[in-house]
């Protein structure tokens, strides 16, 4: 008997009209749907008249319950994986189940659809050819600032998810770490009634959110323009700096700079000067 297929199905992030006909067909035809929160997903199913059984698959039970879904798949049944909203695995559960299925040779098929970070990026007015997604920042201030400092000189557009009750604190930390003039965008409640997309320098964006408690509600995506070197100064980039720091911990300064240049393609002299600064020898 051949194994079934695991379908990774995107669902709407707000507006139910955004679900695709293919997603509806798959959800109706599979034997079982693994859902992040069955209580949430049942409302989607009731709206569209889907009667497929639901079973919980969330961050607290995914490792233990994954075998249940794998057994159904190995028995020849098709299973769909959904999150509460958007595309599964994007800051949502499902990674362990997908990895286990892949390891066992079970076919995994994506059914594309809504994704908050992509929707936000498409309307943000920030460079979209190169970007990085950092997911949710740590809840505690020290961890949050450390994560932000790690991407302080990242030239690509930065994208974060944030819980509404931490939005103001995170914007304050972004302002302090990245600088108040760095351009940022708050994309809130996308595709819903109170959708908001606001682009301002970080200092102004923080103050605007602080002045209106309504902006501290709902699902939030924060996008920040990538770092730009001062005019006339060549950019190194966060990844090259990370490589340099790792090598400096193991090698003499000159060798570390030379090897970092070979790995990253950044000019050796530029990395050498940065290494001097990092070791306090400039």
Swiss-Prot record:
It catalyses: cytidine(1402) in 16S rRNA + S-adenosyl-L-methionine = 2'-O-methylcytidine(1402) in 16S rRNA + S-adenosyl-L-homocysteine + H(+). It holds the Pfam family TP_methylase. SUPFAM superfamilies: Tetrapyrrole methylase. GO terms for cellular component: cytoplasm. Keywords: Cytoplasm, Methyltransferase, rRNA processing, S-adenosyl-L-methionine, Transferase. GO terms for molecular function: rRNA (cytosine-2'-O-)-methyltransferase activity. It is found in: Cytoplasm. Its EC number is 2.1.1.198. Coiled coil: none annotated. It is an enzyme of class 2 (transferase). Signal peptide: none annotated. Its main location: cytoplasm. HAMAP family: 16SrRNA_methyltr_I (MF_01877). NCBIfam families: 16S rRNA (cytidine(1402)-2'-O)-methyltransferase. Belongs to the methyltransferase superfamily. RsmI family. Catalyzes the 2'-O-methylation of the ribose of cytidine 1402 (C1402) in 16S rRNA. This is Ribosomal RNA small subunit methyltransferase I. It comes from Pseudomonas aeruginosa (strain ATCC 15692 / DSM 22644 / CIP 104116 / JCM 14847 / LMG 12228 / 1C / PRS 101 / PAO1). The lineage of its organism: Bacteria, Pseudomonadati, Pseudomonadota, Gammaproteobacteria, Pseudomonadales.
């Amino acid at each position: 008997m051949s194994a079934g297929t695991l379908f990774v199905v995107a669902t709407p992030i707000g507006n139910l009209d955004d679900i695709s006909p293919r997603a509806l067909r798959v959800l109706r035809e599979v034997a079982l749907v693994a859902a992040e929160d069955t209580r949430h997903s049942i409302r989607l199913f009731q709206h569209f008249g889907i009667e497929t059984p639901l079973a919980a698959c969330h961050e607290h039970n995914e490792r233990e319950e994954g075998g249940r879904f794998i057994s159904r798949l190995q028995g020849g049944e098709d299973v769909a994986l959904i999150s509460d909203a958007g595309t599964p695995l994007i800051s949502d559960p499902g990674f362990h189940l997908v990895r286990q299925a892949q390891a066992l040779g079970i076919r995994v098929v994506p059914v594309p659809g809504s994704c908050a970070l992509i929707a936000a990026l498409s309307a943000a007015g920030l460079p979209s050819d190169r970007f990085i997604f950092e997911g949710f920042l740590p809840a505690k201030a020290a961890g949050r600032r450390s994560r932000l400092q790690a991407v302080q000189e990242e030239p690509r557009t930065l994208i974060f998810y944030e819980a509404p009750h931490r939005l103001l604190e995170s914007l304050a930390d972004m302002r302090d770490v990245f600088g108040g003039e760095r351009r940022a965008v708050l994309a809130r409640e996308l595709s819903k009634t109170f959708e908001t997309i606001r682009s301002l320098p970080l200092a102004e964006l923080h103050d605007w959110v602080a002045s209106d408690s309504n902006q501290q509600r709902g699902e939030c995506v924060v996008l920040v323009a990538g770092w730009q070197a001062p005019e006339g100064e060549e950019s190194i980039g966060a990844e090259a700096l990370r490589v340099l720091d790792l090598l400096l911990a193991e090698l003499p300064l000159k060798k570390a700079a030379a090897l970092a240049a070979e790995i990253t393609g950044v000019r050796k002299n530029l990395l050498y000067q940065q290494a001097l600064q990092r070791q306090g020898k400039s």
